C-alpha cells in the first residue's frame, strides 16, 4: 500500500497524560480522540486500542506507551499515554522525556495520590515545561465543594514542586461520559483542549543544531532492512544522509534510506518528530535502545563526567539509607539504564562529606561501564532496583 505524505501545516506539539493508576488517563485519551473526531481532527480510538499492551491487560495495567495523534484549530498533537503504575516508572521516564507539556489526570473522587506526586516530581525532573490539570470523574462527585477542595489541594501540590500552581488551568472533565456522548461532558473536553492550546507553550524546536535521535526501539522489516525508532531531539535528518550510531559499542556509520512518521513517508524528519529511520546495511543485532543516531562527527561518547544531583528523600520514593563513594547505581540516560559508579562527591557548596543522605544535593563524579553520548547540560536519573533515587544534570565532561 502506498503511504500518504505527512502534511506539515500546523505547529507540532508533543504532549501526554500522566497521573495515578486508575484515575482515567487512558479513558481521557480515548475521549479526546472521540470528541475531536467529530470535527474531523482525529481518528477516534477506543480504550482497548490505546491500552494495547496485551501481556499485561489481564491485570488491568497499561504498560506500553501508546501514541495517538490529533489536531486542534491551531496545532497538531502527538499524545503519549503514560502508564500510571509505579512499576513502570521506567517507561514514564522515556515517555515524559518526550513531552512539551502534559495533562495531569486526577480523579475528583480520590484527589492526589502517591503516584500523582511521583509523576509531578518526574515531570519536573525530566523537564516537562508546562502542565494542565484534568480533574476527571467529576460526574461521580455531587458536592461542588468537594471538587473545589481537590482543586486547591492539587494547586498547592504543584506549587510545592515548583510548578506555577496558581496559574495552571484545572478543567473538570469526565472521560467516560464524554465517550458515551453526553454533550455537556464533550464540551468539557473541548475546554480542556482549549486550555492545552493556550497554556502549553509551543516548544522552541532545536532545529538548527546538529541532528540527534536517541534510539527507543529497533525492529526489522522484511525486505527493507532495520528501522530505529525514537524522537528526534534536535536538528533534522533527510533521506540519503549519512549518520553515525554512537554509544555502548564502537561508533559506526550508516545511511538513512527512509524516514516515516505515523505510518507516512517524509522527505526529512526534524526536531520533535517521533520517527522510524530505515538504516542501510545495519542488522537488528547491531543497534539497541540507548544508542543515539547523530550527524556525522557531531558527538563523541564518554564514560566520565561531573554532575549536580538531587538525591530523593525517602518520602519522594528515594533511598532510606545513605550511600558512600564507590556506590554503583544505574544512570538513566536518554532512553536506557547504564551501570556506573559514583567515584567521588562533595556537598553542593563544595565542602567534603563522608556520605550522602536522602534529600541531599551533591556534586558528583560518575564513571559509566560503557561509553554513552552524554553532553554538558543533559539531565539524567540515578536509579536502583527500578526506582528513581536521584535526579541530576551533567555539569562537565571529563573523558
Swiss-Prot record:
Residues 174-176 are annotated as: G5. Transmembrane segments: none annotated. GO terms for cellular component: cytosol. Residues 136-139 are annotated as: G4. Its main location: cytoplasm. One of its GO terms (molecular function) is translation elongation factor activity. Residues 60-64 are annotated as: G2. Keywords: Cytoplasm, Elongation factor, GTP-binding, Hydrolase, Magnesium, Metal-binding, Nucleotide-binding, Protein biosynthesis. Residues 81-84 are annotated as: G3. Disulfide bonds: none annotated. InterPro entries: EF-Tu_GTP-bd (IPR041709), EF-Tu_GTPase (IPR050055), EFTu-like_2 (IPR004161), EFTU_2 (IPR033720), G_TR_CS (IPR031157), P-loop_NTPase (IPR027417), Small_GTP-bd (IPR005225), T_Tr_GTP-bd_dom (IPR000795). Residues 19-26 are annotated as: G1. It catalyses: GTP + H2O = GDP + phosphate + H(+). Residues 10-204 form the tr-type G domain. Belongs to the TRAFAC class translation factor GTPase superfamily. Classic translation factor GTPase family. EF-Tu/EF-1A subfamily. Monomer. This is Elongation factor Tu. It comes from Prochlorococcus marinus (strain NATL2A). The gene is tuf.
Amino acid at each position: 500500500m502506498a503511504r500518504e505524505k505527512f502534511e506539515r501545516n500546523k505547529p507540532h506539539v508533543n504532549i501526554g497524560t500522566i497521573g495515578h493508576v486508575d484515575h482515567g488517563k487512558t479513558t481521557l485519551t480515548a475521549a479526546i480522540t472521540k470528541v475531536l473526531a467529530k470535527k474531523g481532527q482525529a481518528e477516534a480510538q477506543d480504550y482497548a486500542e490505546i491500552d494495547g499492551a496485551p501481556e499485561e491487560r489481564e491485570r488491568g495495567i497499561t504498560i506500553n506507551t501508546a501514541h495517538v495523534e490529533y489536531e486542534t484549530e491551531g496545532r497538531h498533537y502527538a499524545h503519549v499515554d503514560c502508564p500510571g503504575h509505579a512499576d513502570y516508572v521506567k517507561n514514564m521516564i522515556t515517555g515524559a522525556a518526550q513531552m512539551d507539556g502534559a495533562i495531569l489526570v486526577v480523579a475528583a473522587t480520590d484527589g492526589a495520590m502517591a503516584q500523582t506526586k511521583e509523576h509531578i516530581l518526574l515531570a519536573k525532573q525530566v523537564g516537562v515545561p508546562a502542565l494542565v490539570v484534568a480533574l476527571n470523574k467529576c460526574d461521580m462527585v455531587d458536592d461542588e465543594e468537594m471538587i473545589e477542595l481537590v482543586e486547591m489541594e492539587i494547586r498547592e501540590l504543584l506549587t510545592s514542586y515548583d510548578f506555577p500552581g496558581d496559574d495552571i488551568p484545572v478543567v473538570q472533565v469526565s472521560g467516560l461520559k464524554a465517550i458515551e456522548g453526553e454533550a455537556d461532558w464533550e464540551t468539557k473536553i473541548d475546554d480542556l483542549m482549549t486550555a492545552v492550546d493556550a497554556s502549553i507553550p509551543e516548544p522552541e524546536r532545536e532545529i538548527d543544531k546538529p541532528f540527534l535521535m536517541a534510539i527507543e526501539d529497533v525492529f526489522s522489516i522484511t525486505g527493507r532492512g532495520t528501522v530505529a525508532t525514537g524522537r528526534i531531539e534536535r536538528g533534522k535528518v533527510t533521506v540519503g544522509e549519512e549518520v553515525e550510531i554512537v554509544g555502548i559499542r564502537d561508533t559506526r556509520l550508516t545511511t538513512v534510506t527512509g524516514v516515516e512518521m505515523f505510518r507516512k513517508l517524509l522527505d526529512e524528519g526534524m526536531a520533535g518528530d517521533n520517527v522510524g529511520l530505515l538504516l542501510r546495511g545495519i542488522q537488528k543485532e547491531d543497534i539497541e535502545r540507548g544508542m543515539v543516531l547523530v550527524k556525522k562527527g557531531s558527538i563523541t561518547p564518554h564514560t566520565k563526567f561531573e554532575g549536580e544531583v538531587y538525591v530523593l528523600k525517602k518520602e519522594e520514593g528515594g533511598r532510606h539509607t545513605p550511600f558512600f563513594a564507590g556506590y554503583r547505581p544505574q544512570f538513566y540516560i536518554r532512553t536506557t539504564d547504564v551501570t556506573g559508579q559514583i567515584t567521588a562527591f562533595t556537598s553542593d557548596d563544595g565542602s567534603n562529606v563522608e556520605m550522602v543522605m536522602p534529600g541531599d544535593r551533591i556534586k558528583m563524579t560518575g564513571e559509566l561501564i560503557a561509553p554513552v553520548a552524554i553532553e554538558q547540560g543533559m539531565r539524567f536519573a540515578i536509579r536502583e532496583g527500578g526506582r528513581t533515587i536521584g535526579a541530576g544534570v551533567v555539569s562537565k565532561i571529563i573523558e
